[in-house]
Every structure is written in structure tokens, then in C-alpha cells.
């Protein structure tokens, strides 16, 4: 194992964690992520607080549909209750942020936030916006849409107040406004130095367990079976979602594993009408980008030849795939996203263990800290560790990594 030290100046007031590790995948999860490579789809889920999200729907889109699934929470939940400790306010927000991140590591979705502050219960959206700077929070939602480029947007709450909390209704109002604003170059043009405008195809409200007569025969409502079983994970999405939701420990959450068919309903709020389901007419294959057809064929070959007992056999083909994506795909969004996914798969197939940790948990500006990093690979492929970077510090190593050492 190669160990190295690096001393550098830290400019943050707080180091988030004294230890950092990459996620490690078993062979079935590697296979699942190989299949995700062949899907170019994105969904954004919008709500107000940690624990507002529908973890079943997020699990379904991330693992069944193989989408990039993202949850944007308007707040970090710092105005809520704490059932596991005495932390309140900002410190509770830190705890609930980590609970959300832990939930996403289980259900496979991504997590982002706006700058909105959870100031406690709010009677209506007007009161909420009197505390929040509406334009600033709207800019955050627009940024999220332009950043993750969702094909569809799903709101947890309606704009009409049935959510029972001003924050809930405000999150829906912001989502509907951002749906159009993200495609308008005159709205928040300062963002366009970094992202492009984006028009999602549709925006839906994720309905609250409606009665059959409320949804039957309605052309603007579609049902999604989120209870299907994933053989690679050995779990249904209801089971996966219950594990994810149980991460909200400060709120006393812990839900029983649900199994069997479960329908969630989506009501179209804006966007193009659909025929069969919420994704009708949306191309989520590599054909949506120029040069993608050949990439799809290469990925299919890698999947067909994948060995569960020796995933490292796929590494040479993954390196070639990464090179091909970077040279032949001109759409920067999908090129960067899929190239990163391939890099993560190479690390997973190589059995890499990468860890970095600091000797202290927090520092003040100008202080020095010692960072220790460890790298080990456990495959029969040959790797060289070229350099290690911490922020703007670069250590050139050019060291060969021996197997399992």
C-alpha cells in the first residue's frame, strides 16, 4: 500500500469530515452501473425539507429506469425537531444534511440544496416568501435544473396548499416557475457562463395516495409501479426505499419494508401531453447525442462479456470506452457525466480502496493540517498512480501499484 503525506493551507472554517472514502461496489452493483451507462435520462424531485422526498420513486428512477435521479431540498431542516440529541438550528441542519446524504447513498439518487433557511412552521407560502428571498431561491432551483438537465421534474407537493405547510407549497410554486425560467436566457443570465438553458419536457405533482375515482381515465394522470423487484440488488424498490428513509434518525423515522405492487400517481402540471406514461416520447438512449450509437454498442459488448467473478476483465474495454466518449461525444453534459461514471466503474472493477483523512476534525483559516491518503488496488490489472491532488496542491508520484499491497 502506498502512503503519502501532504501539508497545505485550508481556507474553510470547517472540514466536513476527518475521513473520506469512496463508495465500494459488489459485482451485482457493478453490473447495475454498467447498465446505467446505456441510459441518458434525468429526473429532478423537488420538495422543501429533508425527509419530504419520496424515496420509493427516487429508488425506482435511479435503479429501475437507470436515470440520473436528483432530489433538491429547499432547506436543510434546521427548523425541525431533534429526537436523537440536543442540537438545534444550524447544528441540526448539519445532522439532517448528513442524513439526506446517507439516504442517497442507499437509494442511488443525488442530493442538492437551495440556500433557503428552515425557520420553522409556516402557515402559507406568502409568509414563507417573506422570510426567504424568493428570487434567490428561484435562482437556486433554476441552477439545479440547468445543471442536471432533467427530462421531467416531479414535485412532492401541489401549489394549491394541500401540503399543510408554507414551505411545502412554496417549493411547488418555485418548481413551476423554474420549469419555464430555466429555459429563458433572460432569467439569471449570470448562470450561463457555467451552464446552458434547459427546458424539461414535463413537470408533475406526485399525488398523495388518491382514490381510484380521482385517477381513473384521467389523461393528465399516470401511475408508476414502484414496487417492482430488482434481482441485482435482491430487493424491491419499496424495501430499498424503507432503508433509505430510515436514515432520517433525528426525526424518528424508520419504516417497515414494503413489498409487492405499489402505484404512485403523477399529475401533469405543465409541459407536453403524454400518451402512455410520464416518459412518453422522451429519448433516453445514446441516440439522443451525436455519435452515441457506436458508444451504445460498445457498452452492450462490455455488459455481455462482464464476469461477476472477475470484474477486472472489463477494465481495458472501459478505458477504451472512456477515450471514445471523450473524443467522439460533443455534448459536454453527457460526455462529462458518462466519462465520470466510467471512471467510477474502472475503480470498482479494480477493487480500489482509496481513503484520505485529516489528523484533526476542524481548523481555522491559515492553519495547517496533515492529510494521509491510502491507495490499494486488488485486481490483476496494472495501474500507475501518477499524482495526488488536494485542492490546488499536486503531488507527482508516478508509482506503480502492486496488486493488493
How should each PLM-predicted stretch be described?
Residues 356-360:
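Surface-exposed, proline-enriched loop/turn segments that connect beta strands in immunoglobulin-like
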Residues 361-367:
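Short, solvent-exposed loop/linker segments at the N-terminal edge
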Residues 20-147, 169, 173-180, 184:
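Active-site rim/loop-helix segments in enzyme catalytic domains that contact anionic ligands
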Residues 376-381:
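Short solvent-exposed strand-capping/beta-turn motif centered on an Asx-Ser/Thr pair
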Residues 389-405:
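Intrinsically disordered, low-complexity Pro/Gly/Ser/Thr-rich segments with frequent PxxP/GP/PP motifs
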Residues 369-371:
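Structural beta-strand segments of beta-rich domains
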Residues 22, 29, 181-353:
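The feature marks non-catalytic terminal segments
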Residues 1-22:
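Bacterial Sec-dependent N-terminal signal peptides
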Amino acid at each position: 500500500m502506498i502512503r503519502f503525506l501532504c501539508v497545505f493551507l485550508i481556507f474553510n472554517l470547517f472540514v466536513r469530515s476527518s475521513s473520506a472514502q469512496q463508495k465500494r461496489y459488489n459485482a451485482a452493483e457493478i453490473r447495475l452501473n454498467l447498465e446505467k451507462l446505456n441510459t441518458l435520462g434525468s429526473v429532478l424531485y423537488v420538495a422543501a425539507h429533508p425527509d419530504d422526498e419520496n424515496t420509493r420513486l427516487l429508488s425506482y428512477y435511479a435503479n429501475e429506469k437507470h436515470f440520473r435521479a436528483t432530489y433538491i431540498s429547499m432547506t436543510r431542516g434546521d427548523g425541525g425537531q431533534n429526537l436523537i440529541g440536543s442540537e438545534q438550528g444550524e447544528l441540526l441542519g448539519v445532522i439532517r444534511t448528513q442524513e439526506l446524504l446517507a439516504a442517497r447513498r442507499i437509494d442511488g439518487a443525488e442530493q442538492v440544496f437551495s440556500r433557503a433557511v428552515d425557520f420553522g412552521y409556516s402557515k402559507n407560502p406568502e409568509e414563507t416568501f417573506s422570510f426567504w428571498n424568493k428570487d434567490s431561491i428561484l435562482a437556486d432551483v433554476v441552477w439545479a435544473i440547468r445543471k442536471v438537465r432533467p427530462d421531467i421534474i416531479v414535485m412532492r407537493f401541489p401549489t394549491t396548499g394541500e401540503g399543510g405547510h408554507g414551505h411545502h407549497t412554496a417549493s411547488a410554486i418555485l418548481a413551476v416557475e423554474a420549469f419555464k425560467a430555466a429555459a429563458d436566457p433572460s432569467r439569471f443570465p449570470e448562470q450561463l457562463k457555467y451552464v446552458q438553458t434547459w427546458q424539461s419536457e414535463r413537470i408533475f405533482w406526485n399525488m398523495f395516495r388518491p382514490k381510484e375515482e380521482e385517477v381513473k381515465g384521467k389523461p393528465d394522470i399516470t401511475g408508476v409501479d414502484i414496487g417492482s423487484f430488482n434481482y441485482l440488488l435482491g430487493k424491491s424498490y419499496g424495501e430499498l426505499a424503507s432503508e433509505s428513509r430510515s436514515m432520517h434518525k433525528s426525526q424518528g423515522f424508520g419504516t417497515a419494508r414494503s413489498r409487492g405492487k405499489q402505484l404512485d400517481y403523477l399529475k401533469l402540471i405543465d409541459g407536453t401531453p403524454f400518451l402512455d406514461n410520464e416518459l412518453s416520447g422522451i429519448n433516453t438512449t445514446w441516440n439522443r447525442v451525436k455519435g452515441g450509437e457506436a458508444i451504445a454498442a460498445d457498452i452492450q459488448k462490455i455488459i455481455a462479456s462482464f464476469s461477476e467473478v472477475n470484474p477486472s476483465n472489463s477494465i481495458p474495454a472501459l478505458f477504451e470506452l472512456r477515450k471514445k466518449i471523450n473524443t467522439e461525444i460533443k455534448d459536454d453534459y453527457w460526455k462529462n457525466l458518462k466519462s465520470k461514471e466510467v471512471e467510477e466503474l474502472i475503480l470498482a472493477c479494480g477493487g480500489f480502496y482509496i481513503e484520505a483523512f485529516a489528523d484533526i476534525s476542524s481548523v481555522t483559516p491559515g492553519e495547517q493540517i496533515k492529510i494521509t491518503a491510502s491507495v490499494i488496488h486488488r485486481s490483476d490489472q496494472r495501474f500507475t498512480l501518477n499524482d495526488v491532488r488536494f485542492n490546488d496542491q499536486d503531488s507527482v508520484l508516478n508509482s506503480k501499484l502492486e496488486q493488493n499491497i
